Every structure is written in C-alpha cells, then in structure tokens.
Amino acid sequence: MICSYCGQENSSYAETCSFCEAPLKVKRPKLNGFMYLELCERPFSFLASLHTYDLLVLLRLVREKRTSCYHLMRTVQKAPDGVVVPNDIKALAESEYRLYTARMKVIEGILIDRMGYKPKRIDDKLLERLKEKIET
C-alpha cells in the first residue's frame, strides 16, 4: 500500500506508514459538489468526513437559514401591541434560531481545525478560487 502523504511503499497489512507514520487506511474526503441544508443535521463524524469545499458551501447555507430564522424571531418578538402572538410560536422561533446557531458552530469548529480560521464571509468569489485550486 502506498502512503498518500509521502508516497512510501508499505506492506498491505500495515496500519501506519513506516516512514512518516501517517494512517494508511484513512480515506481522504472527496468533493461532493451537491450540498443541501438538511446535511447539517448529520452527526459530527459525518460532517468531519466532508471535503472542506463542501463544508464551506454547507456553512453558507446554514448561515443563510440562521439569518432568516433570526429575522423571523425578531418579527415575532416585536409584533405590534394589537397583535397577540402565542408563546409557542415565540418559543419555536427562538429554538430554530438556537438550533441553527449550534449547527453553524459545529461546522465552523471543523473548519477551524482544518484551516486554522473560520471565514467571516463565504461568497462566490471565495468558493470559485478554492474550486480552481482544487481542480489544478
């Protein structure tokens, strides 16, 4: 088995590389290219196995959803005096916002572990530059 880090030939039974001691059986993340919001509900182990590009796209989706939940929550909280909003609606809006905040923090934590920082803004320009680097 050839080490994907240093290129050293190892026996097929080896767990780690004899030269650099990198794990040989660990698969590198592959670019998925199709991400949707519901993937953020998957467990940490699944999210950590995603490609960095896919995580950035997913983080962008989660941040957008979190923003819309925040605006909904604020609209419900600041309802005019004549409008009575049931408490369960308020609680639902707040819980949705907290839920997407927690999911956002999980993805940001994985990105910090990989990149050393979390991007403040994930726009098309950032994703295009990263995609170009991946393809070359």
Per-segment meaning from a language model:
Residues 58-61, 65-68, 72, 88-92, ...:
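Charged, solvent-exposed faces of alpha-helical coiled-coils
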Residues 9:
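Catalytic-site/binding-pocket detector for metal-dependent nucleotidyl cyclases
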Residues 21-31:
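Short Cys/His-rich micro-motifs in 6-15 aa windows
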Residues 29-89:
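Long, charge-rich boundary regions
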Residues 3-6, 17-20:
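Short cysteine-rich clusters marking metal-coordination/redox-active sites
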Residues 12:
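Flanking scaffold residues of small Cys/His-coordinated metal-binding clusters
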Residues 111-133:
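Long amphipathic alpha-helical coiled-coil segments
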